[in-house]
Amino acid sequence: MKVSCEDINGPRSSLSRAWNHMSWLYYQYLLVTALYMLEPWERTIFNSMLVSIVGMALYTGYIFMPQHILAILHYFEIVQ
């Protein structure tokens, strides 16, 4: 008879499954970007710069995109 961890400990909670999935996604991020080769302080600097750049891009898009879209709609006379 085969006994699994779920038989002994009961069903895994959704929080545990979510945590494992997030850990797997972070591991994939480290592998795809080759950050696993960096020292922890280098990884922190890289991630900080990445978050800053993405944050600035999202903020700029949020502030300026409505104006540009409205200008395009006026140009093509979709909106008067």
From Swiss-Prot:
This protein's GO CC annotations: endoplasmic reticulum membrane; serine palmitoyltransferase complex
Ranges in the topological domain labelled Cytoplasmic: 1-21, 67-80
Entry superkingdom: Eukaryota
Protein topology in the membrane: Multi-pass membrane protein
Residues in the signal sequence: none
Known pathway: Lipid metabolism; sphingolipid metabolism
SS bonds (residue pairs): none
Principal location listed in the UniProt entry: endoplasmic reticulum
Nucleotidyltransferase keyword on record: no
GO biological process, one term: sphingolipid metabolic process
Transmembrane segments annotated in the record for this chain: 22-38, 44-66
Localisation per UniProt entry: Endoplasmic reticulum membrane
One Pfam family named in its UniProt record: SPT_ssu-like
Lumenal side: 39-43
PANTHER family linked: SERINE PALMITOYLTRANSFERASE SMALL SUBUNIT A
Subunit record text: Component of the serine palmitoyltransferase (SPT) complex, which is composed of SPTLC1, SPTLC2 or SPTLC3 and SPTSSA or SPTSSB. The heterodimer consisting of SPTLC1 and SPTLC2/SPTLC3 forms the catalytic core of the enzyme, while SPTSSA or SPTSSB subunits determine substrate specificity. SPT also interacts with ORMDL proteins, especially ORMDL3, which negatively regulate SPT activity in the presence of ceramides.
UniProt family annotation: Belongs to the SPTSS family. SPTSSA subfamily.
Function description: Component of the serine palmitoyltransferase multisubunit enzyme (SPT) that catalyzes the initial and rate-limiting step in sphingolipid biosynthesis by condensing L-serine and activated acyl-CoA (most commonly palmitoyl-CoA) to form long-chain bases. The SPT complex is composed of SPTLC1, SPTLC2 or SPTLC3 and SPTSSA or SPTSSB. Within this complex, the heterodimer consisting of SPTLC1 and SPTLC2/SPTLC3 forms the catalytic core. Within the SPT complex, SPTSSA stimulates the catalytic activity and plays a role in substrate specificity, which depends upon the overall complex composition.
Identification of the protein by name: Serine palmitoyltransferase small subunit A
Native source organism of the sequence: Xenopus tropicalis (Western clawed frog)
Lineage, broadest ranks: Eukaryota, Metazoa, Chordata, Craniata, Vertebrata
